[in-house]
């Protein structure tokens, strides 16, 4: 009995100690207001990649705390095959994996190239309902795999982690965070970097109520579809019935899809800092209803791609912005531009779509100027 007690004490000495930092910080604003994730479940501390995958996928309510880097690189082997180079063969250009015969069907005239890629990002970590995934301090890193929330999973919080290194050289190399068929999802203070395909993707099924806040979408890369060290595949919001709050995020060194919105998506974009975009930031295509307010566009060639069919209210002037108060609960705030193109769109007909819904509090462009200092991993 005494030896068993000694063993138990020894094991306890090496177990991670729970702290106040091992709980969700703050609460979601906007459409995902009320999300609780794993709630008051006792925190668990995965020590292996297999244990992390198991905790995320199971049916229990969980608070999962990451205390180190979980590196999936090479865990499922690599593949060498023929891909294509639709954007050119220069060293700074992304080349493409022939995923689902994409090269064959859509880029038949592109030069054929050999591609060697890691297989792990093609099998993302599946996240079940009632989960909080939290990074401890600046330690919670997932390398070589993204997260996928799908199959009616709901009530999920992802906070203070860094997802990185998903075959960044290759189009179709992997998505960092993907949602399809969900409800009540909040990801906050997450950094994504060196991603092959989308940093964030919602669709094609309904993602319903989602809040994306205080994240850093880092598009800096050595390989891009625009061959200029700016990642093109940023944020893709095209779910069939989505309400998305996109607030206080830092999106930088991208060249497109920052974000792209279509499907059937009601989106509130407020208080974000868009920086160093070599192409265009927002795309609003058919099915998009978008309000943009209190954002900063700094060194963005085009704040918005023109000629698309989405409905946009860009908070164009103080008088028009006052109409927001009846529907969003506050007067919409002007956006700010520095060495950038400007937004267009003053479709007030979409404002009523926000009436009676959980809308995030107003943020001014002056507030948004500090977002690069507060958004992302390790900044809670």
Curated annotation (Swiss-Prot):
Molecular function via GO: pectate lyase activity; pectin lyase activity
Domain of life of the native organism: Eukaryota
InterPro entries listed in its UniProt record: Pec_lyase, Pectin_lyas_fold, Pectin_lyase_fold/virulence, PEL
GO cellular component: extracellular region
Catalytic reaction equation(s): Eliminative cleavage of (1->4)-alpha-D-galacturonan methyl ester to give oligosaccharides with 4-deoxy-6-O-methyl-alpha-D-galact-4-enuronosyl groups at their non-reducing ends
Annotated glycan sites: 130
Compartmental location: Secreted
Transmembrane residue ranges: none
EC number: 4.2.2.10
Family that this chain belongs to: Belongs to the polysaccharide lyase 1 family.
Protein's recorded name: Pectin lyase
Annotated source species: Colletotrichum gloeosporioides (Anthracnose fungus)
